[in-house]
Amino acid sequence: MAQENLQKIVDSLESSRAEREELYKWFHQHPEMSMQEHETSKRIAEELEKLGLEPQNIGVTGQVAVIKNGEGPSVAFRADFDALPITENTGLDYSADPELGMMHACGHDLHTTALLGAVRALVENKDLWSGTFIAVHQPGEEGGGGARHMVDDGLAEKIAAPDVCFAQHVFNEDPAFGYVFTPGRFLTAASNWRIHIHGEGGHGSRPHLTKDPIVVAASIITKLQTIVSREVDPNEVAVVTVGSIEGGKSTNSIPYTVTLGVNTRASNDELSEYVQNAIKRIVIAECQAAGIEQEPEFEYLDSVPAVINDEDLTEQLMAQFREFFGEDQAVEIPPLSGSEDYPFIPNAWGVPSVMWGWSGFAAGSDAPGNHTDKFAPELPDALERGTQAILVAAAPWLMK
């Protein structure tokens, strides 16, 4: 009976397909940067209110709606909705205006529309399920600390903890329009820093009267690469990237300060902490070795924990997806090196969680990837598969 009711709800999506596609195109044409998604947040709230729901504004621009439908388990689902500072080059007739210099290059518009579509299907078919569904629309995933903002704004206090929490992400993955799962670690922990090295500037012809921060920075950049190659177990995953270096504007002047932009990735939170401490140790030591008296400054930007999927829950979901979509449509893949702030949400509630990926392209992994100017999940399949997945994941807990 549960699978029959699930199928009925999924079938009901057909009647709203055209409206949902138009909604997706609106989100796509109105990209907004992290924690500045005011129009997007307003539109999400309006769509939820049309369904008779009362969304709560949590976490600056975040929106949360609770659908209470009798007794039963509770399922939460999170979708993000911020864009990226990339000029769109997809050629779509619903492309974002290039003059904006922004686009939905990571599919968050698709995540949002899929969740709104699933909520609509649940509201319109309350006779087929029982329990509670929590729709968490999260801002600022792209380095804006959106999940942390929602937690700091009292998400776990304002919204009762669900039994399980889910999230998904669209990728250019194989199989085409299929789903990928990873029991255990799915995504890495990450941190971002700016490190300011304060030397003593002066004329380029008299370096002996200076403490050259550029030379020190060069030594630091080289030494940082030994953290992964000589301090981290080869069976673990860690990356240290110096993504930017800023210092000086003149060819014959030694600057007073050099700033390094540093990013780390690690397969677990403990290793992430170790790598960050190793960076500090090396930077301090190199500055001391160069005779620089002023201590370096470590400007923390943000960090996220690793996405660790509950293994039993992941196996359960894979079985559920294979039963509904077909054996070849839900595959297990190795962990990915990307990162997400999603874990802050289930961690705040203290509930088991799973995040999975789904393919938005007929070409699978040959399609343009996330964070490129040609990233454009294909309608209608990408949207339908994303919407269906939310309902299929929630079914074991909610379907009558």
UniProtKB/Swiss-Prot annotation:
The elucidation of the enzymatic mechanisms of malodor formation may lead to completely new ways to design deodorant actives. A targeted approach to block the enzymatic process offers the possibility of an efficient treatment without perturbation of the resident skin microflora. The enzyme could also be fed with alternative substrates which are designed to release a fragrance note instead of the malodor. Its cofactor is Zn(2+). The keyword Hydrolase applies. Partial loss of activity with the combination Mn(2+) and chelating agents. Activity is lost in presence of 0.5 mM dithiothreitol. Keywords: Hydrolase. InterPro entries: Amidohydrolase (IPR017439), Bact_exopeptidase_dim_dom (IPR036264), Peptidase_M20 (IPR002933), Peptidase_M20_dimer (IPR011650). The keyword Oxidoreductase does not apply. It comes from the Bacteria. CDD domains: M20_Acy1-like (cd05664). Its EC number is 3.5.1.133. It catalyses: an N(2)-acyl-L-glutamine + H2O = a carboxylate + L-glutamine; N(2)-[(2E)-3-methylhex-2-enoyl]-L-glutaminate + H2O = (2E)-3-methylhex-2-enoate + L-glutamine; N(2)-(3-hydroxy-3-methylhexanoyl)-L-glutaminate + H2O = 3-hydroxy-3-methylhexanoate + L-glutamine. One of its GO terms (molecular function) is hydrolase activity. Belongs to the peptidase M20 family. Hydrolyzes odorless N-alpha-acyl-L-glutamine conjugates of short- and medium-chain fatty acids, releasing human axillary malodor compounds. The enzyme is highly specific for the glutamine residue but has a low specificity for the acyl part of the substrate. The two most common products are 3-methyl-2-hexenoic acid (3M2H) and 3-hydroxy-3-methyl-hexanoic acid (HMHA), which are produced from the odorless precursors N-alpha-3-methyl-2-hexenoyl-L-glutamine (3M2H-Gln) and N-alpha-3-hydroxy-3-methylhexanoyl-L-glutamine (HMHA-Gln). This is N(alpha)-acyl-glutamine aminoacylase. It comes from Corynebacterium striatum.
